[in-house]
Amino acid sequence: MGKRGQKPKGKVKIKWSPNFAYAIGLLVTDGNLSTDGYHVSFTSKDFELIANFLKSLQINCHIGRKANGSNPSEKKYFVAQFGDILFYKFLLSIGLTPNKTKTISVINVPNRYFFDFLRGHFDGDGSFYSYWDKRWRSSFMHYLQFVSASEKHILWMRTELLKKTGCVGHISKSKNSSVYQLRYAKRESLKILKKMYYTNTVLCLSRKKDKINKALNSRY
């Protein structure tokens, strides 16, 4: 009988935790699963987000640079890529796929880590904006927004947030856009933000957190 080959060793420790769930959120928005069934990559303009991704998975790997399609000579993006067949298969098992942009749907995240996942999703593709509405005296408006090119995924997120917070939100899609927007205003946004940033030490993209704090501290 021939010798059995060694079982593959995983680079990533597959165990749910706040940081691990945060990394899954990042991968859902800006990650990529190669069609080779082995390589996983994460791309961002923010080097801090690349560092957060690697920290959350407790790994080190080479960080490269790449350009976008419109300007191939300007390499604005950082890319972290590594090979791990066990982690790759795990990602498939929870709902990620290669070429996921428009096909992604439900992501199987444990309830206790959902808001860590959501914070990663927000840091990857979400936004927060605020302004004073000139139509009304002392009317300070602020919105929390999540986006996805997959209608099924954005509907799943809305359903989960409704179950977990009672927040209804609103889904919209511009006529000339391929992206769905899930938006929460004022009280609903505050409720979700408190759950996303439940301590001052949670792993997050500092510039987004600082923007939120600056806006809300000026009003509340």
Kindly label every feature range from the protein language model.
Residues 1-220:
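Internal intein/HINT superfamily modules and their associated LAGLIDADG
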